[in-house]
Structures are given as structure tokens and as C-alpha cells.
């Protein structure tokens, strides 16, 4: 069986117009997959040069397959049918290492056709590295590398206003474009680069903040033989992802036409502010996950998919989303409901086995950031505590007992919470502490909740009643009235 390469598998090729920092699975099944669709169906005509931003030879370079690789997109489509779609991605031209070939890296700035910069250098990538110098070949941090590359372009084109770039980071941090621009400006000032360059940075270049959403499951190790038998070639860079994707870019309206989104309506939104979209994702997608985990796990279920195929647990989650989360969010209801419907479809994806215990990691912080704002907003709006979001808090406290049907399971959180729960549950077991006292002890940790939740009218009472029901009757019986 042949390995992918352009000689044996000839096809479309596109001129270099995009620089991409990062060669990982996510960008390849998200950004590059979208660019490939735009290249095929519009006149975008933009090839990608991947820059490996760190000094490592693993995994091997995409250039070993001439930039070619296959994405397998699978999950439930909008009609709820299971679909699996293989696509040979032809839009990546080559990969270069900023470390092994620094000159080739700088030469990317000399190409007049270069227009876009995408990146995913992990959450830690957009950060300041004190030791980075202008003369380093290359500097360590991604923002310093980008500053050096932008200065190379500025010099090569003598500060031409039409040679700036549209810079679209995909790292999972808030307002990633603004954070990246601030660091680029910091390096420019520290390196004492000319004021004219700093003016060009802000006037000729556009830094966009983004929200990215797609579960990318990467190289399908267990299925490679079967998948390669279907495609008819060997592919060391096979990349799998779910059917759903959403790309929200905070940038000028003109970007839609420049990316040819007017000619192929992908699920890409060019918006003035990503904040409501971020809040929607955190509240609905992440919030539903966090509410689901302790309830489903203590009901004897191990994966998200199984939970969504369980009529009662599914009803609990859907009612939490539609009756308690959506009413307090700040976007049109129909838009929120369509997003929620996509979310529950994603949870049912038969191709992804999402273990509840792995999502349970750091559950206390997740509850505070993902669910608590909606619980408090709901209580303020109606004067009533949202029953399912409150029950999810009781379920979370029960989860930290670390025991299901008499069997222990690992609980992962910061050491302080683990120690606190160990003490509280031991005292409760020895009847030195009532359920109400245990609940009060958890809700009054101001350093965590950023307020004393035990002072919220009725919250201690309701969480105590729910927790007592879970402990005395079991999760199935306790959750039933809320399904």
C-alpha cells in the first residue's frame, strides 16, 4: 500500500498565502479542513505553510507526505443520522521548522501574497518569555517569533500599508487576539524597534480574537488498518473529528468576503464581539457537561453517550439547558436553542467515547465558572433557585465522597478540595456532622466561590434536601422528579 504523496496522488495545489504556527491535530481538522473546503468551492486559492513552533522532531514533518493527509469527520448530522466523511486535505503545501531552518522561516515574510496567520500553540503558547531577544534564531515564545517575522515583513516591504497580515489565533484563552497583539507590542518596545514599525503593527495588521469549537479526536490508533483499507493508502497523519464545528472571529466585516465566506457559507461567524458566543458555549456546552457528570456517574453510567441514551438522565440535562440555562443568557432564544440542539446531538455522537470520570476533573472550579453564574442569575430573575442546577451542586458534593455502589473511584481536583472533602465526608460518616453542616462547610468557602454561598436564601436548605435524597434513596430515585 502506497503512502500519501503528491506524485502518486496528484491533485489541486494552491499558492502560499497562509502561515500556520502549529502542526497539531486540532488545526488540521479545524482550520485547514475549512480552508480546503473554501479552496475547492471558491476562488480563495490559499495554500498553507505550517511552521513548527517548538524544537522537536516528533511527530515527523507533514512534508514527509508533501503536506497531504486525511480528515475523517464523523458524528450525528443535523438530521440525527450517523455520518462519516473522509476528505483528502490538499491545502497544506509543506511544513518548516523555525529551529532547523530559521532563514526559510524569515523568508515567509518576503512573499507578497502572504496574507493570513493562524495559530494554535496551546493555552501556554500566548505568553511572555523574559529571555527572548531580537537576535535569537528563533526566540522561544510564539509571540516573539511572530514579532520577529512581522519586523522582517515590515523591513522587506519598506512599511507598505497593504502588506500587513490578518492574524487569527485559535489558542483557548479569552480574547486571544488582543492578548497576542499586546505581547507583540511588548516585544517590539523591549527590543527597541522603530516607532514607525510599531505604528505599522497596529495600523496595517489586524489581530482577531476567536472562539473555536470542535472536538478533534486525532489519530484513530485502534482503527487505522480498517480506515486505510477504505482509503487505499497509508497516512501517518490521519485526523478524526466530530461533525459539528463553529468558528467565531471577532474582526472587520470585510473579512467574510476576503475569506470567501460569502461564496461558501461555512459555520464561521465574523462578529463585533465574541463575548456572548463564549458565554453561550461555557453555559450550554460546558455547563451541561458539568451538570451531567456527577448525576449520570452516580446513576451507574460511565460515558456521555450512554447518559444521553438514558431517557431519564437525558431529560434532566435537556430541562436544565432549556428551562434553566437558556432563559438567563443574552442572545436571541432561537439561536441559543439551535446551539443547544447541536450540543445534545454532539453528546450523543456514537464515534466518541467520552468517559465521565475524565470530564469530572476539577469539578469544583468547573461548577463555579460554568453553572453558578446561571444559578445566581436564575434566582435573581425569578426569586426561585433553578431546581436542576441546584441538584447538580448536591450531586457534585456527593460525587466527592468517591464511592459508587460500595466501590471507590478516583476523584481529581486540587489538593485543598480533596483534603477538605476527605475530612468532611469522614466526619459525616462518623455522625460527627450533619448533612446540612457538610453542605454549609462547602458553600461557605469564599476563597473558592468568590462569595459566601451559604448566605444565598434557601440554597443550603435545597442542596441539603437534595443531598439527603441522593444518600438515602440513591441517585436514580433522587433525580427522578426532575426528569
Curated annotation (Swiss-Prot):
Domain of life: Bacteria
Protein name (database record): Altronate oxidoreductase
Gene coding for it: uxaB
Any GO MF annotation of the entry: mannitol-1-phosphate 5-dehydrogenase activity
Record pathway: Carbohydrate metabolism; pentose and glucuronate interconversion
Similarity-based family: Belongs to the mannitol dehydrogenase family. UxaB subfamily.
Keywords: NAD, Oxidoreductase
Source species taxonomy: Bacteria, Pseudomonadati, Pseudomonadota, Gammaproteobacteria, Enterobacterales
UniProt EC number: 1.1.1.58
Enzyme class name: oxidoreductase
GO biological process, one term: mannitol catabolic process
InterPro entries: 6-PGluconate_DH-like_C_sf, 6PGD_dom2, Altronate_OxRdtase, Mannitol_DH_C, Mannitol_DH_N, NAD(P)-bd_dom_sf
Pfam families: Mannitol_dh, Mannitol_dh_C
Sites where the protein binds NAD(+): 18-29
Any single GO CC term annotated in Swiss-Prot or TrEMBL for this entry: cytosol
Catalytic activity as recorded in UniProt: D-altronate + NAD(+) = keto-D-tagaturonate + NADH + H(+)
Protein species of origin: Klebsiella pneumoniae (strain 342)
